[in-house]
């Protein structure tokens, strides 16, 4: 108990002024996302998650906009457009859609007004939880969990130790504090044998200590980018690996030619 209290006291709270917002750059990145068990057990539910970050002027306010597009073997699985204030990355608005075989759910939120809407069929308890969370969005600054791949690298990992971040994502009933601990350093080498990623290795239990569930991130120090993520939950892994170039189609498919009679 005393050890747990000492560990909690050692956490350093992250405020908007601590974020390395100046390191954000417009661009597009794609992650391969897949689920798997032990090595050799096979993979499942593979997806390509592409995010485009751009600087825009939204309703007269300088903003960073993150467009997400997730695609699996059946088509589009998820899209999101999140608008962040350019100075402190507060969430100004977000539209998010999840497409599943049994339902399509779209949420729209305006955090400063504590307002959100849900389109699509949801179990009553999940809808109630989401609507409860909407009302808490205007209660101070929070970090948008949905934008973590783009924004997590901006945390002050150079401090070392444990960083405490006030987080929220649509679906939660309220923002909560989540601890990210710098476990050490790792170097990843790309397939060309020469490109090196000198990374912080960062771990979190996603605000549920003792659950046995973890997220671990390899965050490149120089580039401030997530190179790899390994999540452990329910006895399996979910991995995300940054591709060397974004998976974006450059040339359109040729028009189909009618079959000869």
Q: What residue ranges belong to the model's regions?
A:
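Sec-dependent N-terminal signal peptides
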Residues: 1-10
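Short non-domain terminal segments
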Residues: 5, 33, 132-135, 139-143, ...
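Acidic, serine/threonine-rich low-complexity disordered tracts
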Residues: 12-114, 161-261
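Surface-exposed beta-loop interaction hotspot
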Residues: 114-164
């Amino acid at each position: 108990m005393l050890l747990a209290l000492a560990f909690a006291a050692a956490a350093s709270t992250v405020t908007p002024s601590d974020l390395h917002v100046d390191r954000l750059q417009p661009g597009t990145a794609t992650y391969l996302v897949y689920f798997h068990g032990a090595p050799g057990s096979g993979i499942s539910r593979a997806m390509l998650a592409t995010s485009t970050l751009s600087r825009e002027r939204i309703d007269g306010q300088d903003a960073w906009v993150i467009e997400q597009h997730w695609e699996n073997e059946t088509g589009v699985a998820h899209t999101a457009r999140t608008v962040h204030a350019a100075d402190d990355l507060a969430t100004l608005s977000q539209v998010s859609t999840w497409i599943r075989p049994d339902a399509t759910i779209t949420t729209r939120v305006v955090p400063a007004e504590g307002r959100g809407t849900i389109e699509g069929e949801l179990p009553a308890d999940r809808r109630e939880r989401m609507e409860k969370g909407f009302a808490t969005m205007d209660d101070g600054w929070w970090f948008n969990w949905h934008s973590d791949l783009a924004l997590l690298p901006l945390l002050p990992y150079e401090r070392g130790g444990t960083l405490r971040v006030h987080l929220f994502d649509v679906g939660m009933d309220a923002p909560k504090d989540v601890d990210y601990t710098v476990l050490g350093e790792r170097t990843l080498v790309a397939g060309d044998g020469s490109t090196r990623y000198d990374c912080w290795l960062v771990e979190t239990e996603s605000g549920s200590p003792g659950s046995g569930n973890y997220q671990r991130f390899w965050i490149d120090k120089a580039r401030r980018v997530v190179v790899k993520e390994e999540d452990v939950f329910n006895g399996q892994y979910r991995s995300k690996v940054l591709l060397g170039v974004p998976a974006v189609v450059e040339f359109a498919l040729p028009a189909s030619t009618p079959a000869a009679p």
